[in-house]
Amino acid sequence: MLDCSTTCLAIAKEIIQENLKISIITNSLRICNLFHTGSTKVKLVCLGGTLKVRSSSFIGYQTTQALSQYLADKSFMSCPALDIDFGLVDNNLNEGEIRRTYIKQSRKHFVVADNTKFSEAADVIITGFEDIDVVVTNKKLSKKWEQVLQSHDILIDYCE
C-alpha cells in the first residue's frame, strides 16, 4: 500500500526503476498514472472515490470502503507531521481516515518522513506510535525523538 504523498510517489518511481514484481494498492492518482505507463510487472489497484485535486488523491467514504476490502503485507505512508505526544497527525480529516485504514489493513507499517515533519503541527490524529513499525527519515533525529520511537519498539532507518 502506498499513500498519496510525494514521498510514496518517489518510492513508486524506485519500484519502476528496479522493475519489481509487486502488488500496489493506492489512492494516489499520480501513482496510478505512473504505473499506467511505467511497468508491466506491477499489479495495480487504484482506489476510486472523490478526487482531491490539490493532492491528486481519492478520498472519502468510497475510498475508505474500497480500501477496507484489501489486506497488504506492508503499508508506506508519509504525513504532514509527527507529534511527539500523539503520533502521526494530518491536516485533513479525510486523508487522516485513509491513512488510518492503510494501517488497519496492513501487517507492517512504514512511515517515511523527512526531518521537517518531526514536531510540526497538525490537528487530525492518524494514529499513535504503537501502530508504527518503522520510521524512515533523512537526518539524525534528536535524542528525545529517538527515545520516544524506541520506547514504542519502532525501528529507525536513516537514508539519504
Segments and roles (model prediction):
Residues E14-N19, F35-S39:
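Active-site catalytic pocket residues across diverse enzymes, especially alpha/beta-hydrolases
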Residues L2-D3, T26, T137:
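Short beta-strand scaffold positions
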Residues N19-I24, D131-V134:
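Short active-site oxyanion
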Residues C32-E160:
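Conserved phosphate- and dinucleotide-binding cores of soluble alpha/beta proteins
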